[in-house]
Swiss-Prot record:
Pfam families: MMR_HSR1. This is Probable GTP-binding protein EngB. GTP binds at residues 33-40, 60-64, 78-81, 145-148, 178-180. Keywords: Cell cycle, Cell division, GTP-binding, Magnesium, Metal-binding, Nucleotide-binding, Septation. Necessary for normal cell division and for the maintenance of normal septation. GO terms for molecular function: GTP binding; metal ion binding. It comes from the Bacteria. GO terms for cellular component: cytosol. Belongs to the TRAFAC class TrmE-Era-EngA-EngB-Septin-like GTPase superfamily. EngB GTPase family. InterPro entries: G_ENGB_dom (IPR030393), GTP-bd (IPR006073), GTP-bd_ribosome_bio_YsxC (IPR019987), P-loop_NTPase (IPR027417). Mg(2+) binds at S40, T62. Its cofactor is Mg(2+). The lineage of its organism: Bacteria, Pseudomonadati, Pseudomonadota, Gammaproteobacteria, Enterobacterales.
């Protein structure tokens, strides 16, 4: 199995919606989460780059789909943060529609990383994202971010509680604690990404079968 070098990840493009994304080929893994879940920090920690994904002091700032290339045909996709209170309702609905459309229609999407603050996991929209992914046969890795904010016992209890809760989705959903500050959980994230990126892209599998 190839171990991809995530430090070589670089920005490719931003798109306002799925129609403006590059060709639906290769393999993509998407990162999704509430606006303050620490998504940008996780991407920066994964790639060991301070400014790959710009961390914003204003949650809800990332309104575009941002694509980063790990290697040729292997992309990380930073989806718009969702659920921020100060964003107009109309815009929230537009984002949710775009997220749902992406998860349902993007053939090269192999995995979804859902980031949640370990202190406030499984909000409605988090569950909606997991549900959409499971319905589309997409594997999910839940990262419980800011794990350093809890003492060891409380952290374990939260992880176990979420692991128990996601069984209800009847899908392939893995749950791991993560801390950008302490760089804990990064190895688990890399292992999961490696396994997704080592799969045969959907369009190549179809060609091989013909």
């Amino acid at each position: 199995m190839t171990n991809w070098n995530y430090q070589l990840t670089h920005f490719v493009t931003s798109a306002p919606d799925i129609r403006h994304l590059p060709a639906d080929t290769g393999i993509e893994v998407a990162f999704a989460g509430r606006s303050n879940a620490g998504k940008s920090s996780a991407l920066n920690t994964l790639t060991n780059q301070k400014n790959l994904a710009r961390t914003s002091k204003t949650p809800g700032r990332t309104q575009l789909i941002n694509l980063f290339e790990v290697a040729e045909g292997k992309r990380l996709v930073d989806l718009p943060g969702y659920g921020y209170a100060q964003v107009p309702e109309e815009m929230k609905i537009k984002w949710q529609r775009a997220l749902g459309e992406y998860l349902e229609k993007r053939l090269c999407l192999k995995g979804l990383v859902v980031l949640m603050d370990i202190r406030h996991p499984l909000k409605d929209l988090d569950q909606q994202m997991i549900e959409w992914a499971v319905e589309s046969d997409i594997q999910v890795l839940v990262l419980l971010t800011k794990a350093d904010k809890l003492a060891s016992g409380a952290r374990k209890a939260q992880v176990n509680m979420v692991r128990e809760a996601v069984l209800a989705f009847n899908g392939d959903v893995q749950v791991e604690p993560f801390s950008s500050l302490k760089k804990s959980g990064v190895d688990k994230l890399r292992q999961k990404l490696d396994s997704w990126f080592n799969e045969i892209p959907p369009q190549e599998a179809v060609e091989d079968a013909e």
